[in-house]
Amino acid sequence: MKNLLANDLVIQEENCNLSCKYCLTGQSSYKEGHLDKLIFQPPRKSDCASGTTLRGRIDRIIQVTTENMGLPILKVTGGEIFLVRGMMELLEEIAPRFATLVVQTNGVLVNRDYLERLAKLGNICLQISLDGTSYEANAYRSNNSELHQKIYSRLDNIFSFGIPTEIYCVLNNRSLPELQNTLNDLKQYGEHLSVFPFPVRGPDSEQFQVKPDQIPILRSIWETYDSFQPIMPPRAYWQRLMRFYEEKGRNFSCHLPRFAFTTFDDGFVTSCPNIWFNKIGNVVTQEVEPVVESIGNTPFHQILLAPKPRLDACKGCFTPWDTLSMFMDGEITLDELCSTPMYRAPAVRQRLQEIYSEYWETQKCLV
């Protein structure tokens, strides 16, 4: 059985109820639909209820990855997953099979009934996409201030509910100037919430990039870091974020492919949750064993794990997943990593330690 941590299951990535201007799906050439930029079209009706074709594929993907890897974490993301009819029932059914079920959403369709049902499951980590609490900061995600207020009102209900939550805050030339205000607004929600700012990325990201004179804002926040607690990520995360901007890109290693991979609802598998342009195989349409065996065992996988990034996509990449790399590199402790919502479960902690120990034992043998 492979010693991995998480499957990032992407369901209908082009089906969304927002049109974020920097959306990576619209920039992706991974699938024909991405080339057509369907992400900017109106959301479509779909169904993952028991007996549907989509549900059959999802069940197959989860079965294969669970049986062959015993993963403690499943992350379910889109698109916007709650556009899919039957999604809440699917989450309720699969949650008991994992130590942690991560649910990534923009929050617009998450009502009180959903929150109560998610909280009842007891092992949910919400990941909410929000660039800032003001319209100015969130403008690339909201077409107008009225829409932003509607979105933030719904998010306020989510943040107040107490479910462990990570806020994914994309840093761009509109959100970074407002970041201090955003952090001050969010710290009221308490210890169940963590904020993870990370740089906008992708081939079309230049127009959204943080301006050079905005970068010192990150160091200003660093100098008063404790004033934004308890919602801040581990300190090493902020240090690495500042380094990314000051060095104009990634110059440090990435260990993410040692921990996680991506599956799409059509069965395709990729080596890294942050890179969608490399297909390992398909666990729905192909024989399963060779595809599973290829996860972590391809030349492309080794390129991703180079001491310094070799691909342009990697050089421009820094995401909340980077806490895993910091753990492997000794920049944060296991306790610090497991203080964040996604990694708190005991079974997750155990798997993290296993992967860490296995890697460093191998490194000793190579010396």
Task: Set out the residue ranges of the language-model regions.
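Conserved alpha-helical substructure of the radical SAM core
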Residues: 1-121, 366
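Flexible mid-to-C-terminal extensions adjoining Fe-S/redox cofactors in radical SAM and related proteins
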Residues: 1-7, 26, 30-35, 274-367
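Processing junctions and N-termini across compartments
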Residues: 10, 14-17, 248, 307-311
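Short cysteine clusters
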Residues: 16, 20-23, 254, 272, ...
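Radical SAM enzyme [4Fe-4S]-AdoMet core and its adjacent flexible, acidic
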Residues: 31-37, 41-49, 97, 129-131, ...
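Short, conserved active-site loop motifs that form the nucleotide-linked donor/cofactor pocket
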Residues: 123-124, 191
